[in-house]
A protein has these predicted regions:
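Short glycine-rich phosphate-binding loop at a beta-alpha junction
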Residues: 1-6, 165-167, 293, 359, ...
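Conserved RNase H-like, two-metal-ion catalytic cores of nucleic-acid enzymes
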Residues: 1-46, 50, 148, 303, ...
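Conserved "right-hand" nucleotidyltransferase catalytic core of DNA-directed polymerases
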Residues: 22, 39, 49-275, 282, ...
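Glycine- and acidic
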Residues: 28-29, 76-84, 133-141, 280-289, ...
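Helix N-cap motif at beta-to-alpha junctions
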Residues: 489-493
Length: 513
C-alpha cells in the first residue's frame, strides 16, 4: 500500500518528476469522506485530530516562510529542504496513524466494497487529469463572437420594444421592462422584490422576456464558461481538477465526480447552442469525439429499486416495456397517467429530486394550487410505485439513519429537527436532545433520501464503468453527469465502450448506453 492524504496532488507531482507510484494507493482524505461524507473539513489536520488526537505544528515552517518572503503553503516549493523536511515527516507520520484508525472504521461500517471501488477508480482519474482535454482555441474565438452577436441582438430587440437597455442580471431593471410590456412577474415572499428565475422565464410566452432569458444565457456562456476555459488552456489542453469525493476543494456527498479550474460540468446539453459549446473540445489525432451516456440512468435505477421493494405496486407495464427493448420512461408514465410527456418528466424528476408540491407546481408553470394538486393526484393514482418507493426509502433513512447504494456507499442522515411540520434549523443529535427532546425529534432531510440513493448508485455505476474502461487502456476525456466523453479510435472500440458501460453494474431491467 502507498498511503497519502490528498493523493491526487502528491501522485501528480511525483509523476511530474518522472516517477511512477506502483501498487494500491490509499487516500485517507477519500476514505474519511466514505466514513463520513457530511464532515465540514477534510484537511489532514482536522481529520487526524478527530481520529488520532495528533495535529501538525507549522510554527517552524511559517517562520521560515516569513523570512524567505513566501506563502508557507502555496509557495512551499521555494523553501530549502531543511525547512520543509520536518514538516513533511510529520505529515507522513500523521497520515499513517490516521490510516490505522480509518481501517477500524472501514471494518466497523463494512465499507470494504466501496473503498475498493474508489481505490480502483483513482488511477483512471489521475490519467484523466494528466492527459487533459484538447481544446480548439480558434473555435473558442468563433463562439465568443457568435455569443456576443446573439447577446447584442437580444438587447437591441428589448430596447426597440421598450426603450430600455436592461441590466439583464438586475431584477429591478428587468421589472421595468416587464412593467412597460404589461407582463406580470413573481415577487419574493419576504420583501416583495421582483423575482426572475429560470422557470419564470421558461413559462413566459412574451418574446421580449424570452430575449432577456437568451441574453442571460449568452452572457453566462461567454463570460463564465468560455472565459474560464481560455484562462486554463495550457499547450492546447485543459487539465481540470477532478474531485473524486467530498473534500475541502469541492466534490459531492453522493460520490459523483465534480470539476473545478475550470468546471467542465457546466457544459450545456445537446441543444444547438450546447453543441456549439461542446465543439471547442477535440479528440486526439486520428480519433473521433465520442459521447457515451447512460440512457435515462436515474429512471432505470428507480425502477430497479422499486422492483426490489416489498409492497410496491403498478410496475408491471413499465417493466414489460423495458424488457421488450428500448423504452422512454417519461413517455410511458405520460401514457399511463394521461399526461403530456413534459408534465410527466417534470413530475418524475421533481419527485426523484425530493421536491415539495410548491416547487413542483412552479416547475410545471401552474398558478392554481387546486389544479396542481389534481394533476399530482392523477399521477400518483396511475403510477403509485414512485410515491411508495419514496416513502420506503425515507422510512429506512429515518429508522436507520443511513441508506446504502448499489456499490455499498452510505448516505447518512445525522441531523435532527422537530417532528411538527414547519421550517426548522437542523441540529446535531446532542443539540436536538437538549432543545427539542428525544420524543419530539426526527431525522432531517430524509425527503432527499431517494435522490441520494439514485445519485449515489449512478456514481457507483459510472465509476465502475470507468474502472473497467481503464483496465482496457481507455481513458475518458470528460465525465459529465451520466455521460463519458472519450476519444475513440474506431467503431470496434466504440462498441466495446458501450458494452463495458452497459455491464458495469447489472440492474434488474436492461441498461442502455
Amino acid at each position: 500500500l502507498k498511503i497519502f492524504h490528498n493523493a491526487m496532488y502528491d501522485v501528480l507531482w511525483i509523476r511530474r518528476l518522472g516517477l511512477t507510484v506502483h501498487g494500491t494507493i490509499v487516500d485517507t482524505m477519500t476514505v474519511s469522506s466514505l466514513v463520513n461524507e457530511n464532515r465540514f473539513r477534510y484537511d489532514l489536520n482536522s481529520v487526524a485530530k478527530e481520529y488520532t488526537g495528533l495535529g501538525k505544528n507549522e510554527s517552524a515552517l511559517n517562520m521560515a516562510a516569513k523570512e524567505w518572503g513566501v506563502d508557507p503553503k502555496a509557495e512551499m516549493y521555494k523553501l530549502p529542504a531543511m525547512y520543509v523536511g520536518e514538516y513533511a515527516e510529520k505529515d507522513a507520520e500523521i497520515t499513517l496513524a490516521l490510516w490505522q484508525e480509518l481501517k477500524k472504521e472501514i471494518n466497523m461500517q463494512d465499507l470494504h466494497t466501496i473503498v475498493t471501488l474508489e481505490q480502483q477508480v483513482f488511477p483512471c482519474l489521475v490519467d484523466m487529469k494528466w492527459k487533459g482535454v484538447r481544446v480548439s482555441e480558434d473555435q473558442v474565438d468563433v463562439l465568443e463572437k457568435k455569443l456576443q452577436a446573439t447577446y447584442d441582438l437580444c438587447i437591441k430587440r428589448i430596447k426597440a420594444a421598450t426603450g430600455i437597455s436592461p441590466e439583464i442580471w438586475a431584477a429591478k431593471s428587468i421589472a421595468k421592462v416587464c412593467d412597460k410590456l404589461g407582463v406580470k412577474y413573481d415577487r419574493t415572499e419576504k420583501t416583495g422584490a421582483p423575482s426572475f428565475t429560470k422557470n419564470s422565464f421558461a413559462r413566459s410566452k412574451n418574446l421580449v422576456v424570452k430575449s432577456i432569458a437568451t441574453a442571460r444565457q449568452m452572457d453566462k456562456l461567454k463570460n463564465t464558461f468560455l472565459h474560464s476555459i481560455r484562462n486554463f488552456v495550457y499547450n492546447g489542453r485543459i487539465h481540470s481538477d477532478i474531485h473524486q469525493l467530498r473534500g475541502d476543494q469541492g466534490g459531492t456527498v453522493t460520490g459523483r465526480l465534480s470539476y473545478s479550474h475550470p468546471n467542465l460540468q457546466q457544459l450545456p446539453n445537446y441543444s444547438p447552442i450546447g453543441m456549439g459549446i461542446r465543439s471547442i473540445f477535440i479528440p486526439e489525432e486520428g480519433c473521433q469525439w465520442g459521447c457515451f451516456d447512460y440512457s435515462q440512468q436515474e429512471p432505470r435505477l428507480v425502477i430497479h429499486y422499486a422492483m426490489n421493494t416489498p409492497g410496491v405496486t403498478g410496475l408491471g407495464e413499465i417493466v414489460a416495456q423495458y424488457e421488450k427493448g428500448d423504452a422512454d420512461f417519461h413517455q410511458i408514465v405520460a401514457d399511463i397517467a394521461d399526461l403530456e410527456r413534459r408534465e410527466a418528466k417534470t413530475i418524475n424528476l421533481g419527485l426523484f429530486y425530493g421536491m415539495g408540491q410548491a416547487k413542483l407546481q412552479a416547475q410545471l408553470g401552474i398558478d392554481d394550487t387546486d389544479t396542481a394538486q389534481a394533476l399530482l393526484k392523477q399521477y400518483h393514482s396511475a403510477v403509485p410505485f414512485v410515491k411508495q418507493l419514496i416513502k420506503s426509502v425515507m422510512d429506512r433513512a429515518q429508522r436507520k439513519g443511513r441508506i446504502r447504494t448499489l456499490g455499498g456507499r452510505y448516505c447518512r442522515f445525522d441531523m435532527w429537527e422537530p417532528k411538527q411540520f414547519g421550517m426548522h434549523k437542523p441540529l446535531t443529535f446532542e443539540q436536538a436532545e437538549t432543545e427539542i427532546g428525544i420524543g419530539n425529534m426526527k431525522r432531517a432531510f430524509t425527503y432527499k433520501a431517494l435522490n441520494k440513493l439514485i445519485q449515489g448508485s449512478a456514481a457507483d455505476m459510472t465509476k465502475q464503468a470507468m474502472i473497467n474502461l481503464h483496465k482496457e487502456g481507455i481513458v475518458p476525456m470528460i465525465q459529465l453527469h451520466d455521460e463519458l466523453d472519450i476519444s475513440v479510435e474506431n467503431e470496434k472500440q466504440s462498441n466495446k465502450i458501450i458494452e463495458i458501460m452497459k455491464d458495469a453494474i447489472p440492474l434488474d431491467i436492461p441498461n442502455k448506453v
